[in-house]
């Protein structure tokens, strides 16, 4: 029991800075929305539409680079720190390489908006925002590379502190470029993109400075010796990270596609759906942070060849996640009216949002299990299992079920938004079951098998 308490304490210490950094990241999006809304509803809508294109694209890159976390954690745990600089420098090259196709996708924004038949003025502002934020892509991915290094070393506080510096810097920069202060042009919503680009380059510079000057990382000296890019290493990292990137992309696009499928049902339903999704996304940060911490702990334990310790870290992570999810689910059920009223004063929207928040409460526990089990499997480097199972859960089970229940009369009369939310519950529950079973299978393997997985 003492081991479990110690592990829970270590996980919470690692997860808390990750959570706070996520809050800072969300805060930047909130500031963008509010300040753009201060100019006009069109500017606010343009920033929202631009984010729906920008986020899936950049999250794919982040997913690829997240593969570095268990790599670094295992090298650190196995006292092979001298190999870490090579891996991080290969990660830097990979970050720059994948910036190119991501920028290529973002440059197609005009074409995407034409397909969506977006109103001309809003489309112009959306394209302007994307063209400004394109310059942030390399900085964002380079920052993620260095963050994977510090997180893998169990140093999650630097990214947290720098995330809040970025948030504090984002506010005045938005004010300057959105409203045209200190001689800057008044760019409206496009100014949010300019501010975001500056902030991410500053955040990258600050984390680079920390990595190069920190006494805790001095022995590694990650950029002390130059390591030439190696094609084999790039392919290995890409293969390791691609399943995670694809799994992230599946999940993000699932919610984005549902938002599009709900949109013809009318503004009241769309608004209520947005309220429930926004709140559940905020709550999701808790288990997501625990999942990130579990990935680090499992990777470190496997590096030490401590298979039993990796199993304990996985189990404790799921227990902590379930405890937190139970608390947030109870709060959601009891406070759903108050939560809805924080977003809107429209009684029809509040009434429907309260119903959807009940669905959100139902899937919080299974959502916690799936994201933490995925984090543990990342620690084992069992990336392909995450990819296969999330694809089946979200796109074979969740989305089709949601569409059938929400928009057709094949089984019952069309349920509208509630049908799609039942699809979420089915998809996330399926992911939790499949990933949980895979993790249990991993724990039952011989120690040599588990360690061989982690040596991929």
Curated annotation (Swiss-Prot):
GO CC terms of this entry: plasma membrane
Membrane topology, as annotated: Multi-pass membrane protein
Subcellular location field: Cell inner membrane
Record keyword Transmembrane helix present: yes
Gene Ontology molecular functions: antiporter activity; xenobiotic transmembrane transporter activity
Superkingdom field: Bacteria
Keywords: Antibiotic resistance, Antiport, Cell inner membrane, Cell membrane, Ion transport, Membrane, Sodium, Sodium transport, Transmembrane, Transmembrane helix, Transport
Signal peptide limits: none
Function: Multidrug efflux pump that functions as a Na(+)/drug antiporter. Confers resistance to several drugs, such as norfloxacin, ciprofloxacin, ethidium, kanamycin and streptomycin.
Family per similarity comment: Belongs to the multi antimicrobial extrusion (MATE) (TC 2.A.66.1) family.
This protein's name: Multidrug resistance protein NorM
Species, as recorded: Vibrio parahaemolyticus serotype O3:K6 (strain RIMD 2210633)
């Amino acid at each position: 029991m003492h081991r479990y308490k110690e592990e829970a304490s270590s996980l919470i210490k690692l997860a808390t800075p990750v959570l706070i950094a996520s809050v800072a990241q969300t805060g930047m999006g909130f500031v963008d929305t509010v300040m753009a809304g201060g100019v006009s509803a069109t500017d606010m809508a343009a920033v929202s539409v631009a984010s729906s294109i920008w986020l899936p694209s950049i999250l794919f890159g982040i997913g690829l680079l997240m593969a570095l976390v268990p790599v670094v954690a295992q090298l650190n745990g196995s006292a092979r720190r001298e190999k870490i600089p090579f891996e991080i420098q290969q990660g830097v090259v990979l970050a720059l390489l994948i910036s190119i196709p991501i920028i290529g996708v973002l440059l197609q924004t005009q074409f995407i908006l034409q397909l969506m038949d977006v109103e001309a003025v809003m489309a112009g502002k959306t394209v302007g925002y994307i063209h400004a934020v394109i310059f942030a892509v390399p900085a964002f991915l380079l920052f993620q590379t260095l963050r994977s290094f510090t997180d893998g070393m169990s140093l999650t506080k630097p990214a947290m502190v720098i995330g809040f510096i970025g948030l504090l810097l984002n506010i005045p920069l938005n004010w300057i470029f959105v409203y045209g202060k200190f001689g800057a042009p008044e760019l409206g919503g496009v100014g949010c993109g300019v501010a975001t680009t500056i902030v991410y380059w500053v955040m990258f510079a600050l984390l680079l400075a920390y990595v190069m000057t920190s006494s805790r990382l001095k022995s590694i000296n990650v950029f002390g010796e130059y390591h030439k890019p190696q094609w084999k290493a790039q392919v290995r990292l890409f293969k390791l990270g691609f399943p995670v990137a694809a799994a992230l992309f599946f999940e993000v696009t699932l919610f984005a596609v549902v938002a599009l499928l709900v949109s013809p049902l009318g503004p009241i339903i769309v608004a209520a759906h947005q309220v429930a999704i926004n709140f559940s996304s905020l709550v999701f940060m808790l288990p997501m942070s625990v999942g990130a911490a579990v990935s680090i702990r499992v990777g470190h334990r496997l590096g030490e060849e401590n298979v039993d310790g990796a199993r304990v870290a996985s189990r404790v992570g799921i227990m902590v996640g379930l405890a937190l999810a139970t608390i947030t689910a109870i709060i959601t059920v009891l406070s759903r009216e108050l939560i809805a009223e924080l977003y809107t004063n429209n009684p029809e929207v509040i009434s429907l949002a309260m119903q959807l928040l009940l669905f959100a409460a139902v899937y919080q526990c299974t959502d916690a299990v799936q994201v933490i089990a995925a984090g543990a499997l990342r620690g084992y480097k069992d990336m392909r299992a995450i990819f296969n199972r999330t694809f089946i859960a979200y796109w074979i089970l969740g989305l089709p079920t949601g569409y059938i229940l929400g928009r057709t009369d094949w089984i019952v009369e069309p349920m509208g938004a509630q049908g799609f939310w039942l699809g979420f519950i089915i998809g996330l529950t399926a992911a939790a079951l499949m990933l949980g079973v895979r993790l249990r299978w991993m724990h039952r393997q011989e120690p040599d098998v588990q360690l061989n997985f982690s040596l991929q």
